[in-house]
Amino acid sequence: LTPPAERVSEPTSDPDIEVRTYFARGRNALIARGDFSEIFAAWYLHRMDHGIEIPAAMEDPAREAIASITLHSASRPWKEACAWTVKFPEPRLNVFAAADNHTGSVIANFQTSDLQPIGEGMFYADVVEDAKPPRRSVVDFREKSFLRAVEVFYSQSEQRLVRFFWHGEEDLVMVAAQPDCDEEWLAGLTQDSIRTLDRDVELSLLEKRQFTFRCGCNQERMLDFMSPVFQRQADELFHGDPSISVLCPRCGARHILTREALEARTSKPSHE
């Protein structure tokens, strides 16, 4: 595959990337590709802004989570939003990633402390599409790599083969089986064959989509998030302090909430 073309969209306040999807003629496979350098840089700055320290062992799984869920989302319907929670047993680690086609947003978070031991990896996939009821799939796995765990999820839940390949440090390629796919060809793909894929296979461009690392959490949303807890156990929550620090469960951003603000929020009539 040759390098992706320069981004053609107008610049925004958040760095965005372009993901392209192709159809491999004669092989009946969908190919999605993106250069994630801008999103990885935005994720790094997000961590610096909020004092989020990431263990060295977390760097690769988190990057793989951000990139793979973005490519997965780019291959899905426009009205669909998806979220993955992936639990690794050893080392004990939870990785969360979400992507929304409607907003073009991608986020990720992780947890390494206060986790119960588990015997095998667990992959939870949640999907929301327009007004349809949310759907959840749960798959167990034994792989150590996040990308291999996604491949197991596709095999067991989606009932089709998918492969992931890094084309560079920040350039990921996904090849997913479609109906009547040449699965022997797909299973036999290697790092070297990915480099010449556009010369060996006829590729037809399907779509271009834009994605940005952005959560959307803010003070108002965190007040709504914490209000039910405050109503049940306000004193236990604050321990006499005028404010508390709350982490967004989706992106790990730190928000300072005052008792006064929560009291004002919970005292509002329900119709307001």
Spans of model-derived segments:
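Interaction interfaces in information-processing and related assembly proteins
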Residues: T2-L206
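Cys/His-clustered metal-coordination modules, chiefly Zn-binding fingers
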Residues: A177-E272
